[in-house]
Amino acid sequence: PGSSAKKDASGEGSGALHVQSPDWEDQNIYFVMTDRFFDGNTANSDQKKGEYDPSTIAKYSGGDLAGVAQKVDYIKGLGATAVWITPPVANQWWDPMVNYGGYHGYWAENLMKVDKHMGTLAEYQALSRTLHGNGMYLVQDIVPNHMGNFFRIQNIAGKDVFVKNTDSVPVSKPSQSPFNKTDFSNQAQRDAAIYHWTAGISNFDKDEDRWTGQLSDLDDLNTSNPDVVNALKKSYGYWIKAAGVDGFRIDTVKYIEHGFWNDFLWSADPANPGIMTQAKNTGRDNFIAFGECWNAAGAFSDAGDKLTASYLGTEEKPMLNGLLNFSLQSDMVDVFARGKSSDRLAWRLESLVKEYGSLTRLYNFVDNHDMDRFLASANVEDLETALLFMYTIPGVPVIYYGTEQEFQDVRASMFAAGYNSGGKDHFDTESRLYKYLASLAELRKSSKAFTRGEVTVFASTKQGAGILAYRSDSPDGKRMITVSNT
């Protein structure tokens, strides 16, 4: 099916709900913060709980799943073949303890419902069908580490004090069992141990602290409790079956112990099958589960990657089958935006192969929703050079929405009515970077050297900006040479 596959009159999208898995090495991903992308159904924007206000970054702006579906042609024109959306599940809309909202999707209250701001299950299915009808794929962001902030445990004068977030909007505890057992003062709920009853993480370098403490006051799930693991398998497996999701991006991976991942993803237990088993049952034999394991390392250091790579597991006991490439992102900003020596990229590429076995398991990006945009500290030419590098090495390119329209604000809206949009839509298919990214996607498609090649840097600088030249030798004997000036 080509680009003629548009939504039909019923608005249900024209593709199949379930399609076979692609080779992920050949994909280009467009990452959308759904609330800030496009408002396709204005009726769901304001749920009248004081949670909607496009004039502030802290509240909902109105973007939704219908909006993403309506812009599939725009995304496809960039050369993107998959769309990664922020978590669409029912969220805590407003947390009065921190005066901020859950528009971003990472503060769940029910893992098996679509958030009312995002739309309905039917609209989610329509997005899936529309993507599939265009030969594209759907990646859902998931969060097994925590729910929203419905309680706090504060250490006051050496004693743990339990505080309920009673004014949380729209609910003061999750509406889904067993995640609704948030009351530490209730002995039965405390004993159910759905959560780690802990204060905030005090030492991020200490495994036990990181795995069991609350991250930013978010209620930390006890992922070593089989009841929790089975509920997470059921909840997230549901979206593969019900919405035709083709892959997961997994949030906050390093905040969960290693033992969880093999069971959650790969278990063949018929009573509580893992995600991969559930995906296979829908015909997806190459379901992707790539994770965020953000470890700042610094130039010429592989310390961060050693921890990150450990979440791939082993052949006998696999864990995630892809990881976001934070160390390369940091080096790309240093080299292409800050004029540092290009030999740090040469060093990094070699180091990544050593740590991960292959560059193809990595998901590359220049910026994302949790950091300053590349263009906040660099010009368009710098960004173009960084993107050329990213599209001519193995590792799946991920483009954060708005990059193609020269966005500098990390969570600004693409649509006129949304937060910090400047009062206009930003879907210009003639923009310089939109056309440039489309041409890079075509270039990448032209040779397996770019998607599966062995990369050798043969010229780089030891001080300051300058040449970066490398060859990519593909498995089919083709060689591509890329030369750029950083």
Report residues per predicted region.
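Short, P/G- and charge-enriched loop/turn segments at secondary-structure junctions
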Residues: 16-19, 350-352
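Beta-strand elements of modular eukaryotic interaction domains
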Residues: 19-20, 279
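Substrate-binding/active-site clefts of carbohydrate-active enzymes
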Residues: 21-27, 35-243, 263-268, 273, ...
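Active-site-proximal helices and loops of the catalytic beta/alpha 8
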Residues: 11, 128, 146, 234-358, ...
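Structural recognition of the beta-strand scaffold that forms the well-ordered cores
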Residues: 28-33, 81-87, 105-113, 137-144, ...
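Bacterial Sec-dependent N-terminal signal peptides
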Residues: 1-18
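Surface-exposed cleft-lining segments at the edges of enzyme active sites
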Residues: 372-376
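Conserved interdomain hinge at the start of the Helicase C-terminal
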Residues: 383
